[in-house]
Amino acid sequence: MTHQPAFTTPTTPIPDAEHLYIQLLNQLRPVFAQSAPPALIGIHRGGAWLAERLHRDLGLNEPFGTLDISFYRDDYATTGIRTNVKTTQIPFDIENRVVVLCDDILNSGRSVRAALNEIFEFGSSASVQLAVLYDRGG
C-alpha cells in the first residue's frame, strides 16, 4: 500500500474523511481477498473504529484485534498513564502472519512504533502493513 503524505496549508483544505476511507477500503480489498488474508488490528481510539468499519465493509469472517498502546509509548514516563486505558484484544495467532495495523492519522510514527512493540509481545508476525486514513507527513 502506498500513501502520499497529505500536507495542508492555509490554502489547501483538509480532505473529506469519508473520501479518504473509501480510498483506503478500495486499496485493502485485494489485500484481504488473498487465500491467506492478513490479520486486522486497530490502535485504540482512532484506529480501533477504523479497523471495526473495515472489518464490516470488507466482510471479514475472522475477528479483528485492538491494541491499547498506553504502556508502550516512549513518553509514558513523562505523561503518565491515561485514565481511560482500554483492553488489548488479539483473538487470533499472529505468528508468521501478515498483520494490517490501522490508525486514523500518521504523524510522527510514535504510535505505530508503540503498537509494533506490543504486537511483538504476541508473537513474530511475517510482516506488518500500515493502513492509515490520513498521513500528515510528519
PLM feature spans:
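PRPP-associated nucleotide enzymes
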Residues: M1-G138
